[in-house]
């Protein structure tokens, strides 16, 4: 495997060289807990990348939300293009957990919508940990939630080599055991299909498929192919196919688990009936016996994760398997924005436990469901071999446990921390409006943070009435829309972004020159020392960065944030004078922020249909045909087959129009190849097309 190697157009500068050296020395000397106290815009991610390069160890980078994790994933992919950089977050686009509300006698069934691309990336991440040592995984708090046993997942992989003798039926049975489904019509991730002596497998972690050609029981040839077009991409001497799901039920374990579940059911029924909970006992019996019947028939059931303790053969209260168990013992842990991430990790267990305890008490689940849970913080801590906590405002835990704090205050660009000014609240909106107009006239952007949703909505409406292009970012906005809003802000689609608690950590917005903090003197976590420092940091990437605090008194939190910002500004000024550095604003392409994020959570795009072909020239027809062909393939890839069929029909109409033009050479160059591709789209919808005869309609 290639070594972990950073590819960057610049070398470490400012405080980065000494920070890298201190962190590496700390790791080499065995320090378990280190903190990188880095100001906004000082290149903390670059520093961590250089540390990883020097220690050459598999690394887990944890962030506190999907958006920040996606941003880090994109950055590490750029820093380590030759290495395996994975992304592991919750794969739910929409998720409603199973719950029961006793006061309303309301049972809420679990509902989940899985994002296929994130699921693929999760498999890609875990498989990289079994096949490579040059691995960096960027994860959210999902890393501490239950996952299948790494032993079951890693040791059962199907390995095939060209030229070896393998019984085809046994290979197919192995694929079934690995949770692959046979589907000769709809070929997608986690399925395989058989055509004569040819077996095709679509791995759960891949965007391409494997084609295995056999002569009897001999593997004659293996190739990697495009699953849509069938185009051969590369020849393979050997392949390794990992399970299609992270939970792999073993036949022997399944039977033992079913026996244990029946025994637990009997015990819990006796307990409930002894307390006079007849309704709860009847409910539990009906639900559990139904699940057992499905499991005996199919080897799987909805909500099988609630029986994971029995499936994994764990004892009551035993630590569940998580992503952390997939790493080697000496892995490096990096926790980004640790002042938020650490409390989040600490709180996951209690929130999950409370909800499930209610389900158990009222007969919806067996007590063993409580062991389908995230790690307790003590359990998480036991997995930590060596950790680096990264934050501009480290929390209590970091200060209590650190063995070394490394400061990174100086920015390589010479940019100074923003000027902070406190203004009275009287007439604050009119004052803010004037400041916004001045900033908009210079082509920069503005962030405004409020304390309440009502105030944010009213302010957004008022600014729009005043002719200011304004958008409101709130907690109901999903990940994709949030990314779009941030991109539009950077592109100048609008100029002012108003929010509450969403304008703090991790937002990389170099175009923002003004941050306005309304009600800065109100007590609470939204105006705490760390919150104010983080909000101020949003203006630290612009050469004219300014922060306006609207308040009638200066609170201790405000005083600390202003003093700390002033201290950092003075340090940067001295450094700039000593080295003759002229501050320069950060210039970062918009794609740097958004492309990596949207890749991991992209919704199917809208497909454009063509105009009237009769009104087009020959050259225009060629362009439209090529464009429609690409859209048709993308629609089929997104399983939008109705749209693919519509585009196919339009392609047919285009080609008929083109046929009227007496240029046979051009006609053949366009018409021959696209027809073959159109057939592939038809084939992927599950309708065979043989020798010009169509069996079934799309």
Swiss-Prot record:
Question: What positions does the domain UVR occupy?
Answer: 622-657
Example of a GO biological process term: SOS response
The UniProt record lists the Helicase ATP-binding domain at 25-183
Q: CDD domains given for it?
A: DEXHc_UvrB, SF2_C_UvrB
User: Chief location of this protein?
Assistant: cytoplasm
One Gene Ontology term, aspect cellular component: cytoplasm
Q: What does this protein do?
A: The UvrABC repair system catalyzes the recognition and processing of DNA lesions. A damage recognition complex composed of 2 UvrA and 2 UvrB subunits scans DNA for abnormalities. Upon binding of the UvrA(2)B(2) complex to a putative damaged site, the DNA wraps around one UvrB monomer. DNA wrap is dependent on ATP binding by UvrB and probably causes local melting of the DNA helix, facilitating insertion of UvrB beta-hairpin between the DNA strands. Then UvrB probes one DNA strand for the presence of a lesion.
Q: How does it assemble?
A: Forms a heterotetramer with UvrA during the search for lesions. Interacts with UvrC in an incision complex.
This chain belongs to the protein called UvrABC system protein B
What is the protein's species of origin?
Answer: Herpetosiphon aurantiacus (strain ATCC 23779 / DSM 785 / 114-95)
What is the primary gene name for this protein? uvrB
